[in-house]
C-alpha cells in the first residue's frame, strides 16, 4: 500500500530555487524578476486563449515575464528570440483560476514584520 500526502501549499511544491537555476543566476545567464499573482494569471488566461492550453500557475509567471520582455522589444524595435519553459498544465489548479476569474484572488506581499517573524522561527529550528 502506497500513501501520498499532498502538501497544503497550492501550486508550487518546492518554494525555493534549484541548484542549476541558482548557478545560472549567479553567473549572469538569467535574471530574477518579480511577477505578482494577478499579472501571472492575466498572462495565463491570455496564453490559454491563444494556445488552447491552460498553463499551471507556476508557468504563468514565466509567461508573464515573457510577455513583459516581448513588450519591451516591441517598444524599442529590438528583435530577439525569447524562450520560456511551460512546466505543466493547470488542470489541477482550476480552483485558483476560478478564484482569479471571480475576482477573489488578490496580490499578497509579506510585510517586513512577517518576514522577520518567519526568519526568527527558522533560526529556532537549529
Stretch-by-stretch model annotation:
Residues 53-54, 75:
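Intrinsically disordered or highly flexible coil/loop and linker segments, enriched in small
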Residues 35, 56-58, 85-87:
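Generic beta-strand/beta-sheet core signal
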Residues 54-66:
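Substrate-binding/catalytic subdomain of NAD(P)-dependent oxidoreductase enzymes
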Residues 65-126:
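Catalytic phosphate/nucleotide-handling subdomain of diverse soluble enzymes
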Residues 12, 16, 39, 61, ...:
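Glycine-rich beta-alpha junction loops
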Residues 1-53, 99-126:
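Active-site/ligand-binding loops adjacent to catalytic centers
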Amino acid at each position: 500500500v502506497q500513501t501520498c500526502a499532498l502538501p497544503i501549499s497550492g501550486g508550487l511544491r518546492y518554494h525555493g530555487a534549484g541548484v542549476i537555476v541558482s548557478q545560472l543566476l549567479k553567473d549572469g545567464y538569467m535574471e530574477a524578476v518579480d511577477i505578482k499573482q494577478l499579472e501571472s494569471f492575466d498572462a495565463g488566461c491570455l496564453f490559454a486563449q491563444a494556445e488552447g492550453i491552460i498553463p499551471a500557475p507556476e508557468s504563468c509567471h514565466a509567461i508573464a515575464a515573457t510577455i513583459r520582455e516581448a513588450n519591451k522589444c516591441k517598444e524599442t524595435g529590438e528583435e530577439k528570440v525569447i524562450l520560456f519553459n511551460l512546466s505543466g498544465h493547470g488542470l489541477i489548479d482550476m480552483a485558483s483560476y476560478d478564484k482569479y476569474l471571480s475576482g477573489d484572488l488578490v496580490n499578497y506581499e509579506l510585510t517586513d514584520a512577517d518576514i522577520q517573524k518567519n526568519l526568527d522561527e527558522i533560526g529556532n529550528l537549529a
